[in-house]
Amino acid sequence: MARKATITKDEIVDAAFRITREEGFQQITSRKLATEAGCSTQPIFRIYANMEALKKDVYEKAASYYEEFYASFEKKNEVPFVDLGMAYISFARKEPRLFELLFLMPHEENAKSTYELVNGSCDAVTEQIRKAGESGTKNPDQLFMKIWIFIHGAACMAVSGDYDLDHEQSLAILKSCYKDFAG
């Protein structure tokens, strides 16, 4: 009789996700994962044909985690793109390893684009572009691209430790960017 598997696919993905959050996506190895999951490498390779298949599931878990992070982020600003930017910068500060995985690392062709990740299932970007258009912005899509370059740059600076603005300063700058870019 075959021995019952004592570790599940979800437990393996959760362990790999923890490694990613703490050390980075590139640090996932079968041995390190086995230690984190509390098993040998055998169950990992019984469930996954290779580490790349596992890493796809970790990426999907990170993408879902970002969507949950954005959904729970307090949104209280009337100025379009401000809450979107504040959430993105906050995620970069709080979860730098996950931010690197989702928004800075190259991925396979079937991975989600940055736009798809940020837009999410709630159409966050689409909604903000609509909101900007309703407020009288002549070209809200172009405005989004301009302000997104600033938002992404600020988030990258947060990951590298070069972003020292507090919440209120970040808020003021995002509002100012919107006003300046909207013309």
Question: What residue ranges belong to the model's regions?
Answer:
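Amphipathic alpha-helical packing segments from all-alpha helical-bundle domains
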Residues: 109-135, 141-145, 172-183
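Basic, helix-initiating cap at the start of DNA-binding domains
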Residues: 1-23, 32, 36, 53
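Amphipathic C-terminal alpha-helical segment
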Residues: 101, 148-166, 180-183
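Hydrophobic alpha-helical connector segments
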Residues: 57, 71-97, 143, 147
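Amphipathic alpha-helical linker/stalk segments
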Residues: 56, 60-83, 123-131
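Alpha-helical DNA-contacting segments of helix-turn-helix folds
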Residues: 20, 53-62, 69, 102, ...
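Append "Primarily bacterial transcriptional regulators
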Residues: 28-35, 44
